[in-house]
Amino acid sequence: MPEEGSGCSVRRRPYGCVLRAALVPLVAGLVICLVVCIQRFAQAQQQLPLESLGWDVAELQLNHTGPQQDPRLYWQGGPALGRSFLHGPELDKGQLRIHRDGIYMVHIQVTLAICSSTTASRHHPTTLAVGICSPASRSISLLRLSFHQGCTIASQRLTPLARGDTLCTNLTGTLLPSRNTDETFFGVQWVRP
């Protein structure tokens, strides 16, 4: 008859089976908790508003122009208007007010209504200016553009803006801006502190 085993008995720890039986579900539970936490964190990040991520941004469309004596352009923004939005900055009587210090990209495009290259040169000088109009202590011109012989001008620049700065846009001359949102728009984007 063949011999079974070596004849030496190996003592097993009585809690070994219990330890194995408890360890497997514990590790599995930790892995499941980790996966669930990562998924919830990713969902929370996707649902954060742009302001909390550090993105102050606005894209505005022309609302209306003031009286003939007032060269100021008034803007509007919001999701009900289509591609127009405000995240961070706000509108104050049609002018854009900044809520966070930093370097911003300011951009604008204005197309003159009922314009051809010959009418643009006849009504020279028609000028568009963008500047900080309030507070008065920080009043400064940021962009000044002439239409010369064209009907559309567009420009952008990086500039430092401070909390409370209000940006104003002025159109001097006899021609009016187009209300078409593809032709006339104004916006800012926070770039860095």
Curated annotation (Swiss-Prot):
GO MF terms, alphabetically ordered: receptor ligand activity; tumor necrosis factor receptor binding
Disulfide bonds: 115-151, 133-168
Protease keyword on record: no
Extracellular domain ranges by topology: 39-193
Superkingdom per UniProt: Eukaryota
Compartments it resides in: Cell membrane
UniProt-listed GO biological process terms: adaptive immune memory response involving T cells and B cells; B cell mediated immunity; B cell proliferation; CD27 signaling pathway; extrinsic apoptotic signaling pathway; positive regulation of T cell proliferation; T cell activation; T cell mediated immunity
Ranges annotated as spanning the membrane: 18-38
Impact reported for residue 137 to E: Decreased CD27 binding
Record PTM text: N-glycosylated.
Any Pfam family matching the protein: TNF
Bilayer disposition of the protein: Single-pass type II membrane protein
Assigned GO CC terms: extracellular exosome; plasma membrane
UniProt KW keywords: Cell membrane, Disease variant, Disulfide bond, Glycoprotein, Membrane, Signal-anchor, Transmembrane, Transmembrane helix
Alphabetized CDD domains for the sequence: TNF (cd00184)
Residues in the Cytoplasmic compartment per record: 1-17
Impact when changing residue 178 to A: Decreased CD27 binding
Result of changing residue 63 to Q: Loss of protein expression
Subunit structure comment from the entry: Homotrimer.
Function: Expressed at the plasma membrane of B cells, it is the ligand of the CD27 receptor which is specifically expressed at the surface of T cells. The CD70-CD27 signaling pathway mediates antigen-specific T cell activation and expansion which in turn provides immune surveillance of B cells.
Involvement in disease: Lymphoproliferative syndrome 3: An autosomal recessive, early-onset immunologic disorder characterized by increased susceptibility to Epstein-Barr virus infection in B cells, abnormal B-cell proliferation and increased susceptibility to B-cell malignancies, including Hodgkin lymphoma. Patients usually have lymphadenopathy and hypogammaglobulinemia, and may suffer from recurrent infections.
Entry similarity comment: Belongs to the tumor necrosis factor family.
Name of the protein described by the UniProt record: CD70 antigen
